[in-house]
């Protein structure tokens, strides 16, 4: 099935050709090779327009002619198949979630990792962190074995549509034009997005998402969410949609000796946020030294709090699936099962019937995959 993220802005007359080009590439990306006639039928464009666009893409090396269609079931003259050259370009993808390490990869247009690298921050905040990131990107660019389409960066914090980091406290970045700064330093297009949004894009494009609406909950040093509804990434009026990690999950009404304990201070300055019980450091502390049965009970207690937080979101958005991105040994099993049961308890059947709650199939590479999609979408209109 051909699908793409729905444009978030109006398509102006001057953008029509780019939109048509995107439609052709989108079909080839998701549906595989087809003849010019097939492309015209599937996109609704005229054959003349498709032939013109295919000629342009052939000249750029983005597509290749693959020989004639098979004879079986074919009436009339066989067309020449055209396919996307997934090895024509590489993408530099960088994940900045880790407090100590930069994670990066060279990825082809199909999302396959060509090379993966890590580097340690000299200092994970401020201008030094930015300099470390720039050096890391240069090293990945130098390792590319074919032309680079662009650089995608999945950053913590609140990031606007222009790739400006409005606020990333753990990096001490505020109002930083990260995309523009890196583009000037590296000489290639750079696209920057929030790490949870990037994980949602990666799941949408490469992770086998079920339908038009999903939420990806990223669980690492912190907790965040990326949301796609009806094929559009939800960013909110302040570009801060998905900050579920800072919804209160434990408060003074909870028994101090109860399953999740008393509300704990959060890095945001408040207490009892979901992040204080669900972030990986908190989960690992909770199960440390416990036998399997007790560990399962501890994880189930966190799953209950997660379900309480997610239930109104599922009800409001009528999501098809919720995807947990993080270690499956902690997020799968009792935590996942309990969260799903609580969501169903607290919502009307019509809103949660058929809801899938699963752990990502992309593993720890979800934000890297999403960083690559930032470039695919920004440069080619493909997602």
Tell what function each PLM region has:
Residues 195, 220, 371:
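Active-site glycine-centered loops adjacent to acidic/histidine catalytic or metal-binding residues
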Residues 102-106, 201, 224-228:
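Short beta-strand scaffold segments in enzyme catalytic cores
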Residues 113-213, 334-345:
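Glycine-rich phosphate-binding loop and adjoining helix at the ATP-binding site
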Residues 68, 118, 170, 238-239:
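Short clusters of small/polar residues that mark proteolytic maturation junctions
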Residues 212-277:
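Glycine-rich phosphate-binding loop of actin/hexokinase-like ATP-binding domains
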Residues 1-118, 124-142, 146-147, 252-253, ...:
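ATP-binding/phosphotransfer module of carbohydrate and carboxylate kinases, centering on a glycine-rich
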Residues 30-31, 206, 220:
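Short helix-capping/turn signature of helix-turn-helix
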């Amino acid at each position: 099935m051909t699908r793409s993220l729905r444009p978030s802005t109006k398509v102006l007359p001057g953008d029509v050709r780019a939109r048509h080009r995107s439609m052709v590439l989108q079909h080839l990306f998701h549906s595989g090779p087809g003849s010019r006639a097939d492309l015209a039928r599937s996109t609704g464009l005229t054959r003349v327009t498709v032939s013109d666009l295919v000629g342009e893409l052939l000249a750029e090396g983005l597509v290749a002619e693959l020989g004639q269609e098979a004879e079986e079931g074919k009436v009339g003259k066989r067309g020449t198949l055209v396919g996307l050259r997934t090895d024509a370009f590489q993408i530099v993808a960088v994940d900045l979630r880790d407090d100590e390490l930069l994670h990066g990869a060279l990825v082809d247009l199909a999302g396959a990792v060509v090379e993966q690298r890590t580097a340690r921050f000299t200092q994970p905040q401020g201008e030094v962190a930015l300099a470390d990131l720039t050096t890391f990107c240069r090293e990945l660019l130098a390792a590319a074995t074919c032309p680079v389409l662009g650089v995608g960066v999945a950053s913590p914090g609140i990031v606007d549509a222009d790739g400006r980091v409005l606020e990333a406290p753990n990096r001490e970045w505020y109002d930083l034009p990260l995309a523009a700064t890196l583009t000037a330093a590296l000489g290639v297009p750079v696209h920057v997005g929030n790490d949870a949004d990037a994980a949602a894009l990666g799941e949408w494009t490469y992770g086998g998402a079920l339908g038009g609406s999903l939420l990806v909950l990223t669980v690492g040093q912190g907790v965040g969410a990326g949301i796609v509804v009806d094929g559009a990434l939800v960013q909110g009026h302040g570009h801060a949609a998905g900050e579920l990690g800072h919804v209160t999950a434990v408060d003074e009404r909870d028994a101090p000796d109860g399953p999740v304990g008393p509300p704990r201070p959060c890095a945001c300055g408040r207490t009892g946020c979901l992040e204080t019980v669900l972030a990986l450091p908190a989960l690992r502390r909770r199960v440390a030294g416990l036998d399997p049965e007790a560990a399962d009970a501890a994880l189930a207690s966190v799953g209950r709090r997660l379900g309480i937080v997610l239930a109104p979101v599922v009800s409001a958005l009528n999501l098809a699936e919720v995807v947990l991105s993080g270690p499956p040994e902690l997020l799968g099993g009792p935590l996942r099962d309990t969260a799903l049961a609580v969501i169903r308890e607290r919502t009307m059947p019509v809103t949660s019937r058929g809801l899938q709650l699963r752990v990502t199939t992309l593993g720890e590479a979800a934000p890297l995959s999403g960083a690559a999609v930032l470039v695919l979408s920004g440069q080619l209109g493909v997602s």
